[in-house]
Amino acid sequence: MTIPTSFEMLKGMHIKDAFLLIAMLYLGYLLCICFYNIYLHPLRHIPGSKLAVMGPYLEFYHEVIRQGQYLWEIEKMHDKYGPIVRVNEREIHIRDSSYYHTIYAAGSRKTNKDAATVGAFDVPNSTAATVDHDQHRARRGYLNPYFSKRSLANLEPTIHERISKLLNRLEQHQNNDDIITLDGIFSALTADVICSRFYGKHFDYLSIPDYHFVVRDGFQGLTKLYHLGRFLPTLVTILKCLPQQIIRLILPNLADLIVMRDEIQANGIAQFTSSQTADSKASALVGALGDKNIPPHERTVARLLDEGTVFLFAGTETTSRTLAVTMFYLLTNPDCLKKLRAELDTLPSTEDYQHSLSTLESLPYLSGVVHEGLRLAFGPITRSARVPMNVDLQYKEYTIPAGTPLSMSTYFVHTDKELYPEPEKFKPERWIQAAEENIPLKKFLTNFSQGSRQCIGISMSFAEMYLTISRVARAYNFELYETTAADLDMTYARIVPYPKEIPGKTEGLGEIRVKIVGKNHSQIEE
């Protein structure tokens, strides 16, 4: 009597039974993985929901199916389990602002970015998507001189010139009795500024009638794909190989990214390949990525396209949204607007209300407005985990093994009642008081992250905030149009926060809409 082999048994099975057997074996495999993650995993001692830690399934449901709502489930976990929780099988989230700078550490500690968070937009050659600590430090070093506070002195006249163009556009809208979105016009401003820094010239997005352009539309569309891209990073890579017409039929949002990359290539490749020198101080593109002292593999077209995509996204939408949110809070808190204008009125009279950045930074109330606007705009609130590679970390009684992804969302830091009493309120005075009492509150403003991977554009963003708010808030009177606090509601965390969709109104973008009702003081010069 012979014993049949497994192959012979499968060969004799009906195809339906074979598929059923394979499905059962796969289910058994998944159950074993879930059992391991819950009871045998090195992080099994960290509190958390068993449903969350068994695998990526709960996170996938809330992030992909519910379009970015896992952050609120994490909030519930913290309420139930405490300040440290496992949010999936491999990542720990901590809700304790005092531990923020341990996670997002500065200095030489080797801290990688979590590889699971960088694949969404398929920009692997960008500095922001660089996982390895040492490679990131090298790539950032190539760009640092072009985004330092000192280098902004050369960019300041360009920012002022673009703000003057913005003020002229506001006058046109006033004359036409238009309703405009502050998000739109501020996006055009910030896109022109970042292009000036990256290419050495801007493309006058402020002249576009409705302020819809590829950078802005691309960012808004692609945030809807962000979480799906995290779970299926090769999806974007594969789809990008298809003809653009087909991509637009399947995923219009991805087509916007392709158009934007084509625009970067058209605007930058010729300049990049023809120069290949470090002589240009105006363009980070030519000056940094064209420097012959940089290794050749870091001076490629792929690097240009990926770096350009991230720069335009990050340098446009986060700052423009912060400007719009700050103006919303000034308009809904008229006493704050009155105090700000009174402080600005103490400055010497100048054409178009132009003052140097150094002068504006010395004004305590304006500084409070800028920082409070940043706090309540939040910036990116999705988790951006860091991975300490060579050392175990200790949080209270819990040892966290080296190689474990750790995160803390900006949302929890900016709403920490111990740091910010009445965190839902717009109170510029809290920053003045903190400065007078030598409280390092600015350490806990985390829109730009902290540590060795802090946003390289932080100084430029602050410059745009100071220069723009000081002139726009002083020059014109605005009325909000069909815009309430509900438009700032945070329902979906798709990189940045988005409110619930309101059909026929904001389409889930939460844009700040206004009507210009007059000039505040003297006529603005053309």
From Swiss-Prot:
Transmembrane segments: 18-38
InterPro entries on file: Cyt_P450 (IPR001128), Cyt_P450_CS (IPR017972), Cyt_P450_E_grp-I (IPR002401), Cyt_P450_sf (IPR036396), Cytochrome_P450_monoxygenase (IPR050121)
Membrane topology: Single-pass membrane protein
Cofactor: heme
Similarity comment text for this entry: Belongs to the cytochrome P450 family.
EC number: 1.-.-.-
Glycosites: N125, N447, N520
Other known facts: Trichothecenes are sesquiterpenoid toxins that act by inhibiting protein biosynthesis.
Record organism: Stachybotrys chartarum (strain CBS 109288 / IBT 7711)
MF GO annotations: heme binding; iron ion binding; monooxygenase activity; oxidoreductase activity, acting on paired donors, with incorporation or reduction of molecular oxygen
Taxonomic path: Eukaryota, Fungi, Dikarya, Ascomycota, Pezizomycotina
GO cellular component: membrane
Keyword Membrane attributed: yes
Pathway(s) it belongs to: Mycotoxin biosynthesis
Function field: Cytochrome P450 monooxygenase; part of the satratoxin SC2 cluster involved in the biosynthesis of satratoxins, trichothecene mycotoxins that are associated with human food poisonings. Satratoxins are suggested to be made by products of multiple gene clusters (SC1, SC2 and SC3) that encode 21 proteins in all, including polyketide synthases, acetyltransferases, and other enzymes expected to modify the trichothecene skeleton. SC1 encodes 10 proteins, SAT1 to SAT10.
Compartments where found: Membrane
SUPFAM superfamilies listed in its UniProt record: Cytochrome P450 (SSF48264)
Residues that hold heme according to the record: C455
Domain of life: Eukaryota
Name by which UniProt lists this protein: Cytochrome P450 monooxygenase SAT11
